[in-house]
């Protein structure tokens, strides 16, 4: 990403994604540890080209394709769990079939749902836990995969201290950037560590494969550290 474009995106994002970010003078407590999730051995797959779900993050979705409307209907009659996976580049050649996907995805549970008059759904999917696709079942209107859960244990005391340090580092970098751009930041609050990761990734305007790489990192601390490194590099340009 060119530095001028990066700075412009960051400048716009400082206000556009303020709900997920915090300044050094307005620290917020860390989010409670993620509740352990017991995933089923198989999950329906919802592959998209530009959306990556993360644990402890809520994702609004609109479901309009008939096959995925059937998927949601079946999920609502069962455990309400759907597996989000990212489509690999080149998916367009076989979008209606079984285009290639990244093996690591994130399972989510439907927490809110509304069926519209035309049969479409609007829903909110709350990220539960990462998984790896080991195989797919044949047949059916939508894809179903056998999975291996990839749990992320809650951070220990040392990791929690490191997360706090990275949050402070991010806050300092954002404050410095705001000063450089002549922006007067207001008192922002931090919803959660996972929310900070998502907000910062949005500020940095990551491409889908970069979101995927972020998901595949083993927890909030390495994700936050990776994004803070990128932010620091950009603010030096």
Regions found by a protein language model. Give the residues of each.
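Bacterial N-terminal signal peptides
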Residues: 5-17
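Sec/Tat signal peptide C-region and signal peptidase I cleavage site
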Residues: 17-23
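N-terminal low-complexity, acidic/polar interaction/targeting segments
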Residues: 23-237
